[in-house]
Curated annotation (Swiss-Prot):
Cited function: As a component of the coat protein complex II (COPII), may function in vesicle budding and cargo export from the endoplasmic reticulum.
Subcellular location field: Cytoplasm; Cytoplasmic vesicle, COPII-coated vesicle membrane; Endoplasmic reticulum membrane
Disordered as annotated region, ranges: 485-520, 797-843, 968-1010
BP terms from Gene Ontology: endoplasmic reticulum to Golgi vesicle-mediated transport; protein transport
Family stated for the protein in its record: Belongs to the WD repeat SEC31 family.
The protein, known as: Protein transport protein Sec31B
Gene Ontology CC annotations of this record: endoplasmic reticulum membrane; ER to Golgi transport vesicle membrane; vesicle coat
Assembly, per entry: COPII is composed of at least 5 proteins: the SEC23/24 complex, the SEC13/31 complex and SAR1. SEC13 and SEC31 make a 2:2 tetramer that forms the edge element of the COPII outer coat. The tetramer self-assembles in multiple copies to form the complete polyhedral cage. Interacts (via WD 8) with SEC13. Interacts with SEC31A.
A Pfam family recorded for this sequence: WD40
Record organism: Mus musculus
Residue ranges with Low complexity bias: 822-840
PTM (free text): Monoubiquitinated by the BCR(KLHL12) E3 ubiquitin ligase complex, leading to regulate the size of COPII coats.
InterPro entries attached to this UniProt entry: SEC31-like (IPR040251), WD40/YVTN_repeat-like_dom_sf (IPR015943), WD40_repeat_CS (IPR019775), WD40_repeat_dom_sf (IPR036322), WD40_rpt (IPR001680)
WD repeats: 4-47, 65-110, 119-159, 166-206, 209-254, 258-298, 301-341, 376-407
């Protein structure tokens, strides 16, 4: 495809590969003259912008020079500097070698001329810069002169050695070796190539052809193999390209022969060593594949010869070609056709231009499109990589193994280490030490207290330990209480001593002495005196006044304890009220406590109320959040095991909602106490804004320990994780799987979770472990199993059965013209009964229905044997002329029978038939199956229209045995012209026996279009039977007409087969020239329609389908020999009746394509 063009008679040179943007330098050619015959010479530089769709080049710099150029080359010497774009060297007449500074040419500033030397004796036609040392320039001219110039010291050039040619001759080409920097090769018109070693300063090998007509016009080294070079011949009698290997220099390694005239120039692609570009006097530009020795790209120039072609160093698919008519064209081997492009000179040609031919791109993808390396991540943290082999390049292309490496990528090594430690602790059951180590490793106070709580969950009698972690210990409290009581006892010590003294004085008093003496005497005399009240007690008074005390006394006297308690509460005598309430029942005591707590407002009254009432929900909801520790301690002390988890969750939720982020981490302690794993995970998600692998690992450790403690507490009753926990477990399992720890990841997945994502991950983890899970039961398949083939068959069967449902009443059709058939004789035929179809499960009884009005029976066909097509299928017979009608003729025709011979329950309908034969027609009798029709015309009696008299009429089959369709705008059946010809030539035998009923679907036929209703000549009255005469047979419609069958679409998985074959037929039709081949291709296109219909119906076996797909792939790849081999294998292993309708034609198409390709 042409990209750019420039009208200028010049030689060319591309900018070096590291130069950006891309430039093209042109110098006025010494071998050409323009239309003006100007003798001026210029050096110009153009910028190449491939994004610009126009064909023009951007002019960037121009310099007038003194002489024209035979050769132009652009080197990278000094291009490492930002202000330097390299050096252009030009070879001219009289041995002139000129060097230019590209930067100065582009800027038009300083003098761009670096140096001009005239050491050579003739025209300088060969130049090349050393690819390793940019300061070394090789030049060649007449008289076998070769100089090596050092751009740093241009005064005296060096020679690679003594002149090797005798007699001396011109140097046509020079080329430095692209692998070894001190090797230089030169080409000579005599057909020899000399390889020079600059270290030895002598030629080391000479390559020459055995043919004396070899005239070397070009030379190039292999970019990859240091010992290979190519030579091209300018001789018209030997236009060849020779590939030489210096290790086998006795003869060329390959000889490329496709040009018809001498080769003028060639260029070896630096990005793909298999591609070699050549141009010759035959006005052809060829791109060769040196591995296969074939031309992979052709570009006719359609003008004069191109004497120079060069690959673009920066863009591998682009090359430039310079022609003798003064045009420089920039083309690409990746395009379709440069002739399809709009060219500037198209309007200049007045005569008719021939149609442009399609020029295909490269047949094989070039090397620069091949990925040198690639990789892809796989499940389980696997990295699959590939790269180019490190083995040295072979002289001849050979199949080499390309290794694929599978590596395990671990990005979270600390997560894996901690996961292993956790698994070891779980396996050994030593979680207490694990928790203790986590407490010691915790850096934050909140994390430390959390792990302490988690450790307590694993211990016995955990509530007191929780209280201790909250800062409340029974031992410490007892010590504080004892200290407080001791201080109170010291302050009350003096009053107690005075009381003892009073007792002592009273004991020594005379009254006391007398009393003690009297009591002693009384005990001796009688026990009665032991019960006497001591005389020294002070009597107390029971008040009966109207004040509070009197009312209280009266209430107590009457046993009204409630009233007494109310009086005490009124006077705020709370102790008296409580004491009196205890003397009553429990209800009175509770009521008294409530009244007391309602009246008494102290700092501890709310706490006392909660303790007394045991209303912990109010405590959780009403306490201040700064006292969350005290609230949790109360729950731990007083709450029962039934309400305790719920109350702890309520407290933690309130702390999260009202306490903000400060209390969110503390709320997790409440969830640990309650054993709520789900709430713990939800709280972590709120507290941890951005989840990291390490944070997720920490959470999983906490969840695992808490879950294990619950298992120990509840025994075997394992609770299912909630949605949040399941999500984090799945996330953690994915993290472990990504690090390659598949077994551990699978152990963390909930076993009873039915979420699709979890089930799919479990199934994936199980199968990813490979042999590690041998002997274990595989998890359930995570996807619903769908039997595609069975579902499609069931769908077709159900739709057909719905079409056979007999309606309760047949609607009367619209009025249409009466048609009758001409009477004629018909050959007798034997009636036959449809045989039951295998596999059918739908047994129906056909009941007689009302006969349709009119002199025709729609949908009825005689049971005539249709002509056989290839593949064992048959084309159904078309309607006789006597049965033309405007009603549509659907594919699956219902069974029509006379009530004389059709018995209820005797018909077994096939499952999915396309056509059913006509039921036996004959005179009524006891055994209609054995009766035959006479040779006289067969008559059919039909019912008159509703409301009209029964007027019998007869219609007969046509006398001719030719099966003809009714004339109309459309045929009744969609058959090919060849099949129609067979139908018309098919004659019925003299004694015709109907075949067995057709129970298999006819796949090659489309839906029947509606026939046009055409009138037929009326039958004379002599042929009509008299009124009342017995009718020979009566046709009654027993089933309604099913809906017209719609043509099925080709399944998407088989669309590629049809596309490949149709594209192949189109290409062959365009390429074929003889009439016989074109006709054969047209016939093949018709025959392949049978294949496409079989693909639509799904009747081909998997073996045949696989073979067709493989043939299609071979067709797409252009490998027709391989396609014929696959075709032969499929045809040999398949049933003849299955593939005979399309396989022969497919082979014929492949054979034609193979011949056209050759």
């Amino acid at each position: 495809m042409k990209l750019k063009e420039l009208e200028k008679p010049a030689v060319q040179a591309w900018s070096p590969a590291r130069q950006y943007p891309v430039y093209l330098a042109t110098g006025t050619s010494a071998q050409q003259l323009d239309a003006s015959f100007s003798t001026n010479a210029t050096l110009e530089i153009f910028e190449i912008d491939f994004r610009d769709p126009s064909l023009d080049l951007k002019h960037k710099g121009i310099l007038s020079v003194s002489s024209r150029f035979h050769k132009l080359i652009w080197g990278s010497f000094g291009s490492g500097l930002l202000e330097n774009s390299g050096v252009i060297a030009g070879g001219g007449d009289n041995g002139t070698l000129t060097l230019y500074n590209v930067t100065h040419v582009l800027s038009s500033g300083k003098e761009p001329l670096i140096a001009q030397k005239q050491k050579h004796t003739g025209a300088v036609r060969a130049l090349d810069f050393n690819p390793f040392q940019g300061n070394l320039l090789a030049s060649g001219a007449s008289d076998s002169e070769i100089f090596i110039w050092d751009l740093n010291h241009l005064s005296v050039p060096m020679t690679p050695g003594p002149k090797s040619q005798n007699p001396p001759e011109d140097i046509k080409a020079l080329s430095w070796n692209l692998q070894v920097q001190h090797i230089l090769a030169s080409a000579h018109p005599s057909g020899k190539a000399v390889v020079w070693d600059l270290r030895k300063n002598e030629p080391i090998i000479k390559v020459s052809s055995h043919s004396s007509r070899m005239n070397c016009s070009g030379l190039a080294w292999n970019p990859d193999i240091a010992t290979q070079l190519v030579l091209c011949s300018e001789d018209d009698q030997l236009p060849v390209i020779q590939l030489w290997d210096l290790r086998f220099a006795s003869s060329p390694l390959k000889v490329l022969e496709s040009h018809s005239r001498g080769i003028l120039s060639m260029s070896w692609n630096q990005a793909d060593a298999e591609l070699l570009l050549s141009t010759a006097k035959d006005s052809q530009i060829f791109c060769w594949n040196l591995s296969s020795s074939e031309v992979v790209y052709k570009l006719p120039t359609q003008s004069s010869w191109c004497f120079d072609v060069q690959w673009c160093p920066q863009s591998p698919p682009v090359f430039s070609a310079v022609s003798f008519d003064g045009w420089i064209s920039l083309c690409s081997v990746m395009g379709r056709s440069w002739e399809a492009q709009h060219m500037r000179q198209a309007d200049k040609v007045p005569e008719q231009v021939a149609q442009a031919s399609l020029i295909p791109p490269l047949k094989k993808p070039p090397k620069w499109m091949r990925r040198p390396a690639g990789g892809s991540f796989a499940f389980g943290g696997k990295l699959v990589t590939f790269g180019l082999p490190s083995i040295p390049v072979q002289p001849v292309a050979q199949a080499c193994s390309r290794p694929v490496f599978i590596s395990q990528v671990i990005t979270e090594s600390e997560v894996l280490t901690r996961s292993v430690v956790l698994q070891e602790a779980l396996g050994s059951g030593n979680l207490l030490n694990y928790c203790q180590s986590k407490v010691q490793q915790a850096s934050l106070p909140c994390e430390k207290i959390l792990w302490q709580f988690l450790k307590v969950t694993l211990e016995q009698d955990s509530r007191p330990k929780f209280l201790g972690l909250l800062g409340y210990s029974r031992e410490e409290l007892q010590k504080k209480v004892d200290t407080c009581l001791k201080s109170d006892s010291k302050s009350q010590e003096s009053p107690q001593l005075e009381a003892v003294d009073l007792k002592s004085d009273r004991a020594h008093s005379p009254c006391a002495q007398a009393s003690k003496h009297t009591a002693k005497e009384a005990s001796e005399s009688s026990a009665f005196f032991d019960e006497l009240i001591p005389q020294n007690m002070t009597p107390w008074e029971i008040p009966t006044t109207e004040d509070t005390d009197g009312l209280l006394s009266q209430a107590l006297l009457l046993g009204e304890l409630r009233s007494a308690v109310e009086l005490c509460l009124k006077e705020e005598r709370f102790a008296d009220a409580i004491i009196l309430a205890q003397a009553g029942d429990a209800e009175l005591l509770k009521w008294t406590q409530e009244r007391y707590l309602a009246k008494r407002r102290t700092k501890t009254s709310s706490l006392l109320a909660c303790v007394v009432k045991k209303n912990w929900k109010d405590l959780v909801c009403a306490c201040r959040l700064k006292n969350w520790r005290e609230a949790l301690a109360l729950l731990l002390t007083y709450s029962g095991p039934e309400k305790f988890p719920e109350l702890c969750d309520m407290l933690g939720t309130r702390m999260e909602q009202e306490g903000g982020r400060a209390l969110t981490s503390e709320a997790r302690l409440c969830y640990v106490c309650s054993g709520s794993v789900e709430r713990l995970v939800e709280s972590w998600a709120k507290f941890q804004q951005a989840s990291s692998p390490m944070a997720l690992q920490e959470l999983m450790e906490q969840v695992t320990v808490l879950s294990r403690s619950l298992e120990l507490l509840q025994g075997s009753n394992k609770m299912s994780p909630g949605p949040a926990t399941t999500h984090r477990l799945t996330q953690y399992a994915n993290l472990l799987a990504a690090q390659g720890s598949l077994a551990t990841a699978m152990s963390f997945l909930p076993s009873d979770c039915i979420q699709p994502g979890v089930q799919q991950l479990r199934d994936r983890l199980f199968h990813a472990q490979g042999s590690a899970v041998l002997g274990q039961q595989a998890p359930a398949f995570p996807f619903p199993r769908v039997a595609v083939g069975a579902a499609l068959h069931s769908k077709e069967t159900s739709s057909y059965r719905r079409g056979l449902q007999p309606p309760q009443q047949v609607p009367a059709p619209s009025v249409r013209p009466r048609t009758t058939a001409q009477p004629s004789s018909v050959m007798p035929f034997s009636p036959s009964q449809p045989s039951p179809s295998q596999g059918s499960s739908d047994h129906r009884v056909l009941r007689p229905q009302a006969i349709l009005p009119g002199h025709f029976v729609p949908g009825v066909r005689p049971a005539l044997s249709p002509p056989q097509l290839s593949g064992g299928q048959s084309v159904p017979a078309v309607n006789p002329a006597g049965f033309c009608g405007a009603w549509p003729l659907p594919g699956p025709t219902p069974v029509m029978a006379s009530p004389d011979f059709m018995q209820p329950g005797s018909t077994h309908l096939p499952e999915t038939p396309r056509l059913l034969p006509l039921p036996p027609v004959g005179p009524p009798g006891p055994n209609p199956l054995s009766s035959q029709l006479p040779a006289s015309p067969v008559t059919f009696s039909v019912a008159p229209p509703p409301g009209g008299p029964r007027a019998p009429c007869s219609s007969a089959l046509p006398s001719s045995g030719i099966l003809a369709t009714c004339p109309g705008p459309q045929d009744s059946w969609k058959v090919s012209p060849a099949s129609q010809g067979n139908l018309q030539r098919k004659k019925l035998p003299e004694t015709f026996m109907p075949p067995a009923p057709i129970t298999a679907p006819l796949r090659s036929l489309g839906p029947e279009p509606q026939q046009a209703l055409l009138p037929q000549p009326l039958v004379s009255s002599a042929t009509l039977p008299p009124p009342g005469a017995p009718r020979e047979c009566s046709l009654q419609q027993l089933q309604p007409l099913p809906p017209e069958r719609t043509e099925k679409e080709l399944p998407p998985e088989h669309q590629c087969v049809k596309d490949s074959f149709e594209a192949l037929l189109q290409r062959c039709s365009l390429t074929a020239t003889d009439l016989k081949t074109k006709r054969k291709l047209e016939e093949a296109a018709r025959r392949l329609e049978c294949l496409y219909e079989k693909l639509c119906e799904g009747t081909l076996s998997p073996h045949v389908l696989a073979g067709l797909h493989e043939v299609a792939r071979c067709v797409d790849a252009g490998s027709f020999e391989q396609g014929l081999a696959v075709h032969a294998q499929v045809a040999g292993c398949s049933s003849f009746s299955e593939v005979s309708s399309f396989m022969p034609m497919l082979k014929a198409v492949l054979t034609i394509a193979h011949k056209l390709q050759g």
